[in-house]
Amino acid sequence: MLQLVKVSGKSLLPEYREGDFVLVTKIPFFLRHIRQGDIIVFDHPVYGLMIKRVEHLIPERDEIYVIGTPEFSVDSRTFGPISWKVLVGKVIWHIQIPR
């Protein structure tokens, strides 16, 4: 019910850097309580495994809008909302790698 995921890319700089790790929970209780500002991991059908911040939720339409920190981030501004079905889990712990 937990998964360790390595951060790849720059979508949540400076908080989450390439090479860091995040512990993701797949426990349904936590997934039902996702809210704006949470960090989630999802498996996008085109872009693959992604980590983003929740910008907006519309549960009755099965929509989660996600956003990255930099303006150039590929996120819901590019591909629209994601479905709850592609959600891998919610980040519950961030492991920063010393630089």
Regions found by a protein language model. Give the residues of each.
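Extended hydrophobic leader/signal-anchor segments used for secretion and membrane insertion
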Residues: 1-99
